[in-house]
Design a protein with these regions (language model features):
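Glycine-rich phosphate-binding loops at beta-strand->alpha-helix junctions
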Residues: 2-5, 69, 210-233, 245-247
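Conserved phosphate-binding/catalytic loops in two-lobed NTP-binding clefts
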Residues: 83-84, 231-251
């Protein structure tokens, strides 16, 4: 249950050489529009869409686990999990050697330290401020009249380092406007913004420690400029990126639900 959308992953148990194995077979997103304010209704719609596309009924699903800010409002869920528990498990499934997981979505960012079983053993987050999350970058891209994708691509064309001191969206937007008025190239402004977001995210991750393989999950994986800024801030040469970053926490929920059925 994200701030912008609901993600669903359906896990199916199949037999491989006589042994049961899990396969994630269906994923579906229902975008929560501005008037769609009921998390339970949004979750119901997304869940029903997945069941219909898989040709299943609710009676054929053994458990429904949910995570995210709206998890307590999803009445039909079997159990709710924290974002850290679900994200760590999903990241571990995709990258078994991962020990540092960074989760950056629209409204929140967090860093997690995980063990070999995909359990979050420590975490730090920015739940009270969007300055370390995707919505901050999105607001700044609007100030430059660019899409978020264009914003990320533009930042890759800059090699300048421009510090941004503002700690909230309102003041940062004023800073961006000042840079525009001083004829600073858009590429340099885009990099400055993404560097600032990456710096705040990195500060959270450093509170739990950076070790082992680093994995980035959440919607900001799609922003190539942010990924590069985060590498620089963390001082790492590589960050592992899953193919379906928005679904990793939903996948983690499904994996934990499956484990608890056995």
């Amino acid at each position: 249950m994200g701030s912008r959308s609901v993600k669903v992953v359906l896990l199916e148990e199949i037999a491989v050489d006589g042994a049961p194995q899990l396969k994630y077979s269906v994923k579906k997103t229902h975008i929560m529009m501005p008037g769609d304010l009921d998390p339970d209704q949004a979750a119901e719609k997304a869940y029903n869409d997945v069941l219909a596309s898989a040709g299943l009924t609710r009676d054929q699903v053994s458990a429904v686990f949910v995570t995210g800010a709206g998890r307590k409002q999803v009445a039909f869920a079997t159990e709710g999990l924290t974002e850290m528990t679900a994200g760590a498990k999903g990241a571990n499934y995709m990258f078994p050697s991962a020990r540092t997981v960074v989760d950056v979505g629209a409204e929140e960012g967090r860093g997690m330290k995980t063990d070999a079983e995909g359990r979050a053993v420590d975490f730090a987050g920015n739940e009270k401020c969007a300055a370390g999350a995707g919505s901050f970058a999105e607001a700044m891209s609007r100030a430059l009249q660019m899409s978020l994708k264009e914003f990320g691509e533009a930042s890759l064309l800059s090699d300048k380092t421009i510090p941004m001191n503002a700690q909230c969206t309102v003041f940062a937007e004023s800073e961006v406007v000042s840079l525009i008025h001083s004829a600073t190239p858009k590429n340099d402004i885009a990099k400055a913004v993404l560097d600032a977001v990456a710096s705040r995210v990195c500060a959270m991750v450093r509170r739990v420690g950076i070790e082992g393989e680093v994995v980035l999950i959440g919607g900001m994986v799609h922003n190539a400029g942010f990924v590069e800024s985060l590498k620089g801030a963390m001082g790492v040469e590589q960050i592992s990126l899953p193919a379906m970053p928005e679904y990793i926490s939903a996948l983690g929920c499904a994996l934990i639900a499956a484990e608890r059925q056995h």
